């Protein structure tokens, strides 16, 4: 072997990475040594997993407690008709194993909760959050921020999506600096009631995967401190700054020390 222990097949598979000065053999080796947890194997999780695996991220975890439904197939592109009724983590694992034998896949067929997230974070360097509910989003933010684990966030509805990255730096910012608490239950529709354009999660999920890859490489400028809003109907991107809040209950000066102080299944309030 040569080129930092990449074998002949890997040199061929990742050749378009390796010829880039910004990546090269050393960068590809960093990707192969990286471990990333993807929360959710649905609309956002599909492109996230697809591109992390193709890039050669060596260890990928998938956390999801759902099964494939036929209504998922319009946007959840790693699953097919034969997968209907199967656990999404199993379908996703098989997709990745067909795509890239270099990747070790760990499946976690469970809903991510305050009882298990800390153990999950211990196993991975980076988190990419493709969850579809506020409770999980706030939990991921709080747990990752307190543990110092960087994560990429994405959300979608109808024609619109949002995406950002939080590098879990001391002093923030974090998701709660922008949105201190979740909206009241029932005030914001979800994809099941309001719908979602089938291609939308592809765009947002690919940006999330890009952020995960850059974090693993240690190259480029992430969206830390910025949130991008994408409107597929108008084909526009807008960006806002996310400023650290000194009074943020998570990353602020007097922030909490444990996720167990939060009522995630209610309002995510602290």
Go through the PLM ranges and name each one:
Residues 2-270:
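Adenine nucleotide-associated cytosolic modules
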């Amino acid at each position: 072997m040569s080129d930092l222990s990449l074998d002949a097949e890997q040199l061929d598979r990742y050749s378009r990475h390796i010829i880039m000065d910004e990546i090269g053999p050393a960068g590809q080796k960093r990707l192969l040594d990286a471990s990333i947890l993807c929360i959710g194997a649905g609309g956002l999780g599909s492109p996230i997993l697809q591109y992390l695996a193709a890039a050669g991220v060596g260890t990928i975890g998938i956390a999801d407690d759902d099964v494939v439904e036929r209504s998922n197939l319009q946007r959840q592109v790693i699953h097919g008709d034969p997968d209907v009724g199967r656990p999404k983590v199993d379908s996703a694992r098989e997709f990745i194993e067909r795509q890239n034998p270099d990747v070790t896949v760990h499946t976690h067929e469970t809903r991510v909760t305050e009882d298990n997230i800390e153990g999950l974070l211990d196993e991975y360097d980076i988190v990419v959050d493709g969850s579809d509910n506020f409770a999980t989003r706030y939990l991921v933010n709080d747990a990752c921020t307190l543990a110092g684990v960087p994560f990429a966030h994405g959300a979608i509805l109808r024609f619109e999506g949002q995406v950002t990255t939080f590098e879990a730096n001391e002093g923030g910012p974090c998701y709660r600096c922008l949105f201190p608490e979740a909206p009241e239950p029932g005030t914001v529709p979800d994809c099941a009631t309001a719908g979602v354009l089938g291609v939308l999660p592809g765009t947002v999920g690919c940006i999330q995967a890009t952020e995960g890859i850059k974090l693993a490489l240690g190259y480029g400028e992430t969206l830390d401190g910025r949130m991008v809003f994408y409107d597929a109907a108008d084909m526009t991107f807008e960006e806002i700054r996310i400023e650290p809040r000194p009074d943020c209950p998570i990353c602020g000066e007097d922030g909490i020390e444990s996720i167990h102080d939060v009522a995630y299944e209610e309002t995510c309030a602290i």
